[in-house]
Amino acid sequence: MLPRPLRLLLDTTPPGGVVLSSFRSRDPEEGGDPGGRAVGGGQEEEDEEEEEASVSVWDEEEDGATFTVTSRQYRPLDPLAPLPPPRSSRRLRAGTLEALVRHLLDARTAGADMMFTPALLATHRAFTSTPALFGLVADRLEALESHPPGELERTTGVAISVLSTWLASHPEDFGSEVKGQLDRLESFLLRTGYAAREGVVGGSADLIRNLRARVDPRAPDLPKPLALPGDSPADPTDVLVFLADHLAEQLTLLDAELFLNLIPSQCLGGLWGHRDRPGHSHLCPSVRATVTQFNKVAGAVVSSVLGATSIGEGPREVTVRPLRPPQRARLLEKWIRVAEECRLLRNFSSVYAVVSALQSSPIHRLRAAWGETTRDSLRVFSSLCQIFSEEDNYSQSRELLMQEVKPQPPVEPHSKKAPRSGFRGGGVVPYLGTFLKDLVMLDAASKDELENGYINFDKRRKEFAILSELLRLQKECRGYDLRPNSDIQQWLQGLQPLTEAQSHRVSCEVEPPGTSDSPAARTPRPTLVITQWTEVLGSVGGPTPLVSWDRPSVGGDEVPGTPAPLLTRLAQHMKWPSVSSLDSALESSPSLHSPADPGHLSPPASSPRPSRGHRRSASCGSPLSGNTGEGTSRSAGCGGGVSGPGSSDCRIIRVQMELGEDGSVYKSILVTSQDKAPSVISRVLKKNNRDSAVASEFELVQLLPGDRELTIPHSANVFYAMDGASHDFLLRQRRRPSAATPGSHSGPSASGTPPSEGGGGSFPRIKATGRKIARALF
């Protein structure tokens, strides 16, 4: 770095700019502003010629207060220059309430301890009341009436400045309870003549006028509740009617209004942590309103997924709408999409409300519904859960709050790139629970008073640092520009959330504990495309018309009872629409079923809904008979037919497994032309929660009409070895070698009895029968 005289001679600074020659970060508590700039005209120039040598810290006791003194000894860069005197600064660490007020009204505090005044005004309710603090200020001024005029004028000027700052930053502190203290202050100003004086105390008249406007018996304006009395309960499943981004914007609008009305000082751990104590129900109304909104959003998620509406406080005072797993999966996907849109809007309060509701026990245990949810939705849900992970003290959510929103470039009103539905600029709504937890933990970890009875003001400084972050976020929250939507807000107002007991009972009715928690229910089932199960096709193509999920029904063109809609969906590999396609359909088609119509949620109950888990394609292309009446009258036990060229290479079989005293359980298994008996046996064992390693100890037996059995050889291909007359099988322990049981078959060569006329045989037996016929004819 060039010496200062040489820098002054060589003026190389370009016009309108400044050359940075050196810098040193400063403590904002030690005479500098928060940006690190020193207070004082020539302080920077003096610092350029010095470098810090040593720092000493010690405590001092003075008039009921403990100060932390920091002394910095600087050494000049010029070794021949004399050593300058050390620079000292004092911070109040602890003291009595009277000592805090004296330090507050000390004219030197503004420059030496900048953060003391805002920290005291923001946190004083944790250890005293506003009337008590205001009264001590009036006492201090009255005690100085006999002092020299200069000291009285300086102290009065500081008091007017402090009270003006107090009124501007915390107007909620001034209510009817401080009327007596205000009268004392006004009397003091009139008595001493400062009320009409200009200059340092010239703002006293305006201060008294503004304080009088605030000090009245009127109650503060609280946020309006969301639920209006007399409204009819809304159907929670109507969430499917609204677009996800529109619903997210309305939630953000409500959350932003509540967050802007939040009083940060009411979040203090000494206040919020004691809210449940007797006589404290009136504390922290702005925080309670925010928490109520959070719980209402979470309750809306639980109610809609369960399809239940509360009509009372009792566990059974609930109206439940019957929903099947595919329908609940659509609701899960919808709320995941809403949470993602809230994340894009930086509304972390509603994001966590939706995520916590989906993670709650009544919803998380619905494994059948989660199994029907698309992988994309599950991936988005996992990323949202990661945002609020407790790892590293919610580090990821804190980092997202710290990120600044890049200003959007101006766009034309009719441009295709214009922001959607009123979102302009960038705001933020934090999840308040993170800050409440920090403040409660800080309150529990630090003592309110030291051993000598002094107020621990270092604790209040740490609390004020957290409150300052809330104040910063409130300023950023004003960046929203959203418009209310009456339909969505009316629906939100009409929701009646379930109690914890009600939601648990409804969830257990939807999926009893034995089914949802079993290992079999936790195993994802593959998606199957069925073309040879005539019973299912007949039931789908029966008298109930099929409702397409891909687009609204236009009615009239499709004849009820035909399987054509199902074939169309099978050709599309059963791709159910995501939430985005649902939104577009709802927006574009006025012919969509109304929310009260259960048909708009899913296919009819007779249609088998494949799992949304792991999709698996199967080459099943055999044509179906156009005679639907024949298809509906057939049973699964007599369908099928002989495999051959042009027919399907996969079948659905029903396997019964003997479980001893527990009875029998049937499982449906997809058998392809490549499956051997051991692989089929292993899959059946896995589906019945048995060890597949013992597959060699079991045998697969086909149950034929007339109480006959066909034992599938262990090395045979099940698809070709089975009799086409039946799809029913039995899995049992392998029997020891013994005489064949009359009426049973152990394979093609075990019996000379030909297959029954009504059903087809296996391919080797068909060839043997053909040879016999040829020999008889020729």
From Swiss-Prot:
Sequence ranges of Acidic residues compositional bias: 43-59
Chain segments carrying region Disordered: 1-59, 503-524, 541-564, 581-647, 735-769
Pfam families: RA (PF00788), RasGEF (PF00617), RasGEF_N (PF00618)
Domain N-terminal Ras-GEF: start-end pairs: 88-212
Database matches in InterPro entries: RA_dom, Ras-like_GEF, Ras-like_Gua-exchang_fac_N, Ras_G-nucl-exch_fac_CS, Ras_GEF_dom_sf, RASGEF_cat_dom, RASGEF_cat_dom_sf, Ubiquitin-like_domsf
UniProt cross-references to SUPFAM superfamilies, sorted A to Z: Ras GEF (SSF48366), Ubiquitin-like (SSF54236)
Tree of life domain: Eukaryota
PANTHER family named in the record: GUANINE NUCLEOTIDE EXCHANGE FACTOR, RAL GUANINE NUCLEOTIDE DISSOCIATION STIMULATOR-LIKE 2 ISOFORM X1
Identification of the protein by name: Ral guanine nucleotide dissociation stimulator-like 2
